[in-house]
Amino acid sequence: MKLFQIFPLLLSLTSVTLAADDFCNATGFQGQSVVSTGHDVKKIGNIDYEQWADGGNNSATFYSDGSFKCNFSNTKDYLCRSGVAFSQAKYPSEIGHIEAEYRLVKKSASNVGYSYVGVYGWTLQSGISGVYEYYIVDNWLSQWRPGDWVGNTKFGDFTIDGGVYTVYKNVNGNLTQYFSLRKSERTCGTIDVTAHFAQWEKLGLKMPKITEIKVLAEAGNTGGGCSGSVEIPYAKIYINGKDQDGKSKGGSSSGGSNGQGLGNGQGNGQGQGNGQGQSATGSGKCPSTITSQGYKCCSSNCDIIYRDQSGDWGVENDEWCGCGSRVPKTTNCPSSIKNQGYKCCSDSCEIVLTDSDGDWGIENDEWCGCGIKNTTPTTTTKKSNNSQPTQGQSNNNSSTNTNFCSTSKHSGQSVTETSNKVGSIGGVGYELWADSGNNSATFYSDGSFSCSFRNAKDYLCRSGLSFDSTKTYQQLGHMYADFKLVKQNIQNVDYSYVGIYGWTRNPLVEFYVVDNWLSQWRPGDWVGNKKHGDFTIDGAKYTVYENTRTGPSIDGNTTFKQYFSIRQQARDCGTIDITAHFEQWEKLGMRMGKMHEAKVLGEAGSTGSGTSGTADFPYAKVYIK
């Protein structure tokens, strides 16, 4: 089951929730206090706390009500946390239902390269193999949300306890890390920790035994020291509705003295205590769309906690199971959707977008028609052979080499540029542009090119089709690009885009389709001030961003839009369906104008002293079919 298309009946296996203003306005810092200036793992009252840092001058004050204050100066990595620790590691199912409440006040932060604020824990006694560390991140002290660099496996976006989180796994030697990163930061709230554990388990991320559950503030910088101050005036960990002092959350407990919270089947020996223990073996019925994935059916009295295209789901014994016998059926949807090659959604679909074609949902990470809506069908012209570009048509309008990933080499006439230049060779448009440094680029009449840069703050070279800004992409025809990239001696690259680049007018838009990068990390959420999400475009997953910028453009210094599609998995060679990206953007309300250019691009930059290296493109074609 793929959870990025779930239609959540949100996990509600929790106790009564306190009204937000009961702790979101808390001033905290009550009771006894202790000041820590070194690496301390200690206890105050019933509260377990820790401060840890890699260098710098740091301190933290912890209070017996769970609240704490953290101050750090010139540290490479700093964390302070407060909550619950166990003398013996326990599996989450042995602990009960876990929740955290917190309030965050950011006081100051400078030179913070990465940061996590939320719930944290780790263990040396995993009960599996190796060391495990987990993060549920609701906020951050850095300028940008943590990006895909946190993990070497990205599972996608999931609705967990009412919020959308991106889930990652990272393995570094003996250390395994799990992350849930909230898409929209918040400074106060309740985190259903058990709901995250359950989601991770469903994705195959087996939960180890854990030794702590704490509210965390962490900040660091791999390039130098960071400094700042943060306060957590409210921090509580609840297990089965009770905090460390035995006080009930909201005046009620989520599990009795004998129960074990989230359906671990223990209760007082028969799964009947005051908790929510349930049968260890399902006795109910559920559709084969669930059992064929290896999941069991729940018991007959199960509670549905969300639905997707496979059926209805519950949780028993800390594992997902099929709840009920409803078999999803494919619904009908307008021909204006089916005629574009899209399928109809299942009968449990949720409408996420409405346009002139009808209502749209998402299932299996792909768009689908969600029910019948009476509309006037619109025709989308996907191919046209009548309109041609003003430049580059004669030698670059089609791809004839089907083996370009293995047999490519530069050919034809060539020209070498050593300064900023917009030109053409053999009907192929090209450009070299750089901000400082010693740079050059060689462009060939077959469309291929080679880019060399040294100590440049920003450098780009590109080759492809140029237009006269009189026709839309629909009028020009279906646009594709083939490319092959060879990276050589890349150094000190902080950001980079390799793929397709161009501009439109009316509206003025700068656009990127990014299939690779010369930097160590994939471009992150910092590229755009609006993140539309992840979409399957031409068979691959891309994250789509939109940005509004004021600065240099093809029409001088002005305000313009930027659109990005950033591929989740980099590739060195392939075919990009450019029109498919344009169509996806327009479906999201990102309007395209009249085409000025579409070119294969290599761009690299550094926020520091400058970047150096070579990006060779032995094959590059932009063409219209």
Curated annotation (Swiss-Prot):
Region (Disordered): 245-283, 379-399
Each Sequence repeat, start to end: 259-268, 269-278
Role this protein plays: Hydrolyzes 1,4-beta linked polysaccharide backbones of xylans, one of the major hemicellulose components in hardwoods and softwoods. It is more active against xylopentaose than xylotetraose, has trace activity against xylotriose. The major products released from hydrolysis of xylooligosaccharides are xylobiose and xylotriose. The reiterated 40 AA domain is involved in binding the cellulase-hemicellulase complex.
Residues at the active site: E510, E603
GH11 domain ranges (all copies): 35-231, 416-617
Record field: compositional bias (Gly residues): 252-276
Classification lineage: Eukaryota, Fungi, Fungi incertae sedis, Chytridiomycota, Chytridiomycota incertae sedis
SUPFAM superfamilies linked: Cellulose docking domain, dockering (SSF64571), Concanavalin A-like lectins/glucanases (SSF49899)
Name of this protein: Endo-1,4-beta-xylanase A
Enzyme class: hydrolase
UniProt-listed InterPro entries: CBM10/Dockerin_dom (IPR002883), ConA-like_dom_sf (IPR013320), Dockerin_dom_fun_sf (IPR009034), GH11/12 (IPR013319), GH11_AS_1 (IPR018208), GH11_dom (IPR033123), Glyco_hydro_11 (IPR001137)
Residue segments, region Linker: 255-279, 374-403
Keyword Plastid attached: no
Ranges where the record places region 2 X 10 AA tandem repeats of G-Q-G-[LQ]-G-N-G-Q-G-[NQ]: 259-278
Pfam families linked to this entry: CBM_10, Glyco_hydro_11
CBM10 domain: residues covered: 285-324, 332-371
PROSITE patterns: CBM10, GH11_1, GH11_3
Family: Belongs to the glycosyl hydrolase 11 (cellulase G) family.
Any one of the GO BP annotations: xylan catabolic process
Note on domains (UniProt): Consists of an N- and C-terminal catalytic domains linked to a middle reiterated domain. Only the C-terminal catalytic domain is active.
Pathway: Glycan degradation; xylan degradation
Catalytic activity of the protein: Endohydrolysis of (1->4)-beta-D-xylosidic linkages in xylans
EC number: 3.2.1.8
Molecular-function annotations in GO: endo-1,4-beta-xylanase activity
